[in-house]
Amino acid sequence: FMSQLVNPYKYTIYPGFYESCGPEGEKLIEYVEKEWKKQPHVGELPLDIVAQVVEHGDKAVAAIDKAAAAVTRNKEEFGRLQNDMHCYREFAYAFNLKVKAAQRVLNYQWGKDLNELDAAIPLMEQSLDHYRKLVALTDSTYYYANSMQTAQRRIPIGGDGGKNKTWKEM
């Protein structure tokens, strides 16, 4: 959700979450602030990460689609794996574009230039197009997109009451 990118503090993420999940880096909100203040960046950067994820998705799809012609056994299982790679890529594309749109919104918060908000709109529209492709690829095959069916789980969204378990519901 866009609000998780432009205001992550609203979601009361426990303080050690980022430190425990990977190498040092910056949240998008920190990245944009440092850009505006002309401060040096530290560690992994949000725009680099989303670019890498898109690249990995493209490579995964190219490799598995190329391998498809050579599959002679376990074709159904291979088809599921192939679908996984296409899902990964669509999610990567959707998230990449959403991060770029969120960057524009954060730029607006700093500079008050309405052109930043205008520039965010097509990025979000493209992000939604890729998300809809993800939904289509997972509609009959995937459940528990939010990974936990509890009220305590808030990221990406709560799963209490058996809701928000598929990509379509989210």
Predicted regions and their residues:
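C-terminal non-catalytic alpha-helical accessory regions
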Residues: 1-166
